[in-house]
Regions:
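Positively charged, small/polar-rich N-terminal and surface patches that mediate targeting and assembly
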Residues: 1-100
Length: 100
């Protein structure tokens, strides 16, 4: 079994940004993504996913290091001043690297 190194970029953000972020990450080279609901507590207080305007979602992208870096840089520049957003990148090993 051959494993290949990739990056897992996770972005927790306001649900209102979903469409714009999906367009951005695809334009920046992401081949796909996974979106799930998210709730929790952070510097902007408690976020509860039950009320749509106040909901957060988590967007995950498996990609190469250059793509992860490009996405993080672009999203930080475009959104971090006006929206709640947390991004982090971790190392992962994947099967079928051509998918990512």
């Amino acid at each position: 079994m051959e494993l290949t190194a990739r990056k897992l970029l996770t972005i927790a953000h306001e649900r209102a940004l979903e469409g714009a972020l999906v367009r951005d990450i695809e334009n920046l080279g992401a081949h796909g993504y996974t979106i799930t609901g998210a709730r929790g507590k952070g510097s902007h207080g408690i976020r509860d996913a039950t009320w749509a305007p106040d909901a957060n979602i988590r967007l995950e992208v498996l990609c190469g290091a250059d793509t992860a870096r490009a996405i993080c840089t672009a999203l930080r520049e475009r959104y971090s001043d006006n929206y709640s957003m947390v991004m982090y990148v971790g190392d992962v090993d994947v099967l079928r690297p051509e998918k990512f």
